[in-house]
């Protein structure tokens, strides 16, 4: 088990597969950091692979709403509040990501989305 784990996603809506991803990662670490990508909907960058992903209709929730969805889902799943953190994760700006997640965190990934 690692000390610090990390996952990230848009979580435009935090659904059951996202929760499963978070719980599987949490089982591998003492503390989990959850990064919410595209924290500022106004700065969404058009994605060539799926242009709809950057449209306002595909991003109905604010960072604050997504933060609360993630927090409440993890608490409801039985994860103590002191065992996870939630942070913005502006993935479109890789040069500043170290400001949001420690470089010592182990990143956990999954691939299961409809966009490719």
Regions found by a protein language model. Give the residues of each.
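Nucleotidyltransferase catalytic core that binds NTPs
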Residues: 1-116
């Amino acid at each position: 088990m690692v000390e610090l784990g990390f996952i990230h996603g848009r979580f435009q809506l935090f659904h059951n597969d996202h929760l499963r991803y978070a719980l599987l990662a949490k089982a591998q670490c003492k503390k989990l950091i959850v990064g919410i990508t595209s924290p500022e909907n106004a700065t969404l960058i058009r994605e060539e692979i799926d242009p709809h992903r950057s449209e306002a209709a595909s991003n109905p929730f604010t960072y604050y709403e997504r933060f609360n969805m993630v927090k409440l889902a993890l608490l409801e799943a039985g994860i103590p509040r002191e065992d996870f953190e939630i942070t913005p994760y502006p993935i479109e700006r890789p040069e500043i990501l170290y400001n949001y997640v420690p470089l010592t965190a182990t990143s956990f990934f999954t691939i299961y989305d409809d966009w490719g």
